């Protein structure tokens, strides 16, 4: 199928899976796998800017990840703080706008304060890339929150039932982006793991066998090039 110049991915999401398995494979601590994963994010952010992608949404920590061993969760909390301290100055220079979403309050005041700092520091109006980071996020949990918010607004007569549509749902969601063009999952598993259930309704989905720490700019570019070759019909026929 011929590539279309207009068929470019502007809104990309990534399930960054495989940090732990990569660490075990290389006889390293799990925390070392997560650290390596952060360095890959930096590479993909740089390439996203170069490719003029509007938003990059990454699954850093799921709602279900709270079930992981306490030591691993503690290490991830520290990694979040360290990554912000290390990367925010560069992201600011790159005009990358950071946004965090999900049940972030569960991370505690120290982490939440650092997230707020990072968002404030990178809040550029003329941003080259929106980097949306899911922390403590789950798609089903987001649906529950949306229903509660909208129901409350209806009860308080702030909106009427007839007003409820896609825009109202988006406004009630914690997810900053409306629709995802391309979803990439590394690590070999072929599932979406409760990520952006509403926003990926018409996303193209690519499953990559490589673990996230082995994912490269070259791999990312191949995904973007493969996306260009896809005939996206959105339920229509080619001649519609």
Where in the sequence are the language-model features?
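Flexible, compositionally biased loop and terminal segments
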Residues: 1-240
């Amino acid at each position: 199928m011929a590539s279309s110049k207009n068929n470019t991915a502007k809104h990309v999401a990534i399930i960054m899976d495989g940090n732990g398995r990569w660490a075990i494979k290389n006889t390293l601590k799990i925390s070392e796998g997560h650290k390596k994963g952060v360095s890959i994010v930096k590479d993909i952010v740089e390439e996203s800017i170069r490719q003029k992608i509007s938003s990059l949404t990454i699954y850093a920590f799921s709602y279900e990840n709270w079930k992981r061993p306490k030591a691993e969760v503690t290490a991830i909390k520290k990694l979040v703080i360290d990554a912000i301290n290390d990367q925010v100055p560069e992201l600011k220079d790159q005009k990358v706008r950071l946004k965090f979403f999900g049940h972030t309050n569960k991370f505690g005041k120290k982490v939440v304060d650092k997230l707020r700092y990072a968002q404030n520091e990178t809040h550029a109006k003329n941003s080259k890339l929106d980097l949306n980071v899911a922390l403590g996020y789950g798609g089903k949990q987001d649906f529950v929150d949306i229903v509660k918010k909208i129901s409350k607004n209806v009860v308080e007569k702030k909106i009427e039932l007839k007003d409820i549509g896609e825009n109202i749902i988006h406004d009630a969601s914690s997810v900053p982006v409306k629709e995802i063009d391309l979803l990439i999952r590394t690590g070999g598993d072929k599932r979406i793991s409760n990520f952006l259930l509403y926003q990926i309704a018409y996303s193209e989905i690519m499953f990559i066998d490589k673990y996230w720490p082995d994912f490269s700019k070259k791999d990312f570019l191949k995904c973007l090039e493969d996306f260009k070759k896809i005939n996206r019909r959105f339920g229509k026929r080619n001649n519609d």
